[in-house]
């Protein structure tokens, strides 16, 4: 296919136009007074949402260069969500601001390499400062506050705090559709491990890139599956009884993965091959615990020659399995309580005799996973649209809360970023560059610093604007307030953010800044954009 090439300022401006279109659609959702966006879908019902990553994924622009720009910022939003579980809107706002300021500087003659260095160095200074100001969370009340802020609902905040109290801060919490309009919480037997589908062609939910199996049979293999012949009787048995089949193994030969994926796509069998991504003792432990919790064995050559005598009746069972990009969650495993308890007793006995820290930590982790189970939030709604929107909010809140438990919290509402931006005013920051670069280069590096400093103001400005208040007046007042004092968009008053429960997970904010800086740095150093020229039906080319 023929390609079109666009150079220099023209390329950057077109890419920037796409970034701005996507960012303008996403940033209206930020804050408690943020608005919804309705997404029209070709093959399904419209979706009303204020979830930044969902909006970003749906946007396709007609202009090919603008669409590339939109996709670049969309990737940053998705990446932020993958790492921190939330923060996509903040990442989008920061990326838009940094890119606009950066492109303006480069178009006006600044050296993009120097500006890029300034942006990257300044962002790292801010990330380090956020770590210093981060506050660990310990109480259920603090956990509830984080979840409530993320979801925009005190009721959801309470629900997630209850879930963490039931299964522990590092426990497994998942969501499911309720069959009523009410949203409820329950605990069940379950286990989670690092493992993902061996092929993306096995995915059933393209939007979330995950696959869900209801009432599956489960084959757990402690050895690599090399040929389809090894498991053919089990595949045929699963087809006969109508159950989906989950196969978990350390690895699969390419032939096996291809055959399974093709047959799944054809509808011959509902099967998912999951590669266990643990290694060494951790892999052995994960497979053993999975087998016991689902009522089967981790089959290997030591157990009578692999799968030679294994039938469908020997396989494990569970109520539900969710396979995502990095983890697999097995809910309601059908292993007998007596067998699981004996296994727990064995692990506890080993723990008492172990002195090595690695072994102790692994045993404690296994005991916790097997004994605490899984908390399931069953999401209800008056309509399918309402249920989907609520489920997205709960999943965002779960991710934010886990991030807060992991790395702590900072003042919310964009105030932490505004407060730390002042460290970039320090005149001594230039000293580290003086010995290695010219005065002209230094000036352009400091342009990058100024781009980051000004961009850190954008999230709080947008939250104020979305609340219906004049951002210029309120923002000017905030600049003179003490650190931690911000704008409560609900009450439209200035408050101590942390004391008022308006908080953000440190990990989310750091990741959003890191990804935004990466987008801006890439775009300002772009000199050429290349895209396909579409062909019309007559064979001549058209843009």
Curated annotation (Swiss-Prot):
Question: Would the keyword Chaperone turn up in this protein's UniProt record?
Answer: yes
GO molecular function list: ATP binding; ATP-dependent protein folding chaperone; isomerase activity; unfolded protein binding
Name the top EC class: isomerase
Pfam families per UniProt = Cpn60_TCP1
Where does this protein reside within or beyond the cell? Answer: Cytoplasm
Instruction: Write down the InterPro entries for this protein, in alphabetical order.
Output: Chaperonin_Cpn60_CS (IPR018370), Cpn60/GroEL (IPR001844), Cpn60/GroEL/TCP-1 (IPR002423), GroEL-like_apical_dom_sf (IPR027409), GROEL-like_equatorial_sf (IPR027413), TCP-1-like_intermed_sf (IPR027410)
Q: Which EC number(s) are documented for this chain?
A: 5.6.1.7
**Role summary:** Together with its co-chaperonin GroES, plays an essential role in assisting protein folding. The GroEL-GroES system forms a nano-cage that allows encapsulation of the non-native substrate proteins and provides a physical environment optimized to promote and accelerate protein folding.
Assembly with partners or alone:
Forms a cylinder of 14 subunits composed of two heptameric rings stacked back-to-back. Interacts with the co-chaperonin GroES.
What is this protein called in UniProt? Chaperonin GroEL
Instruction: Specify the species.
Output: Mycoplasma pneumoniae (strain ATCC 29342 / M129 / Subtype 1) (Mycoplasmoides pneumoniae)
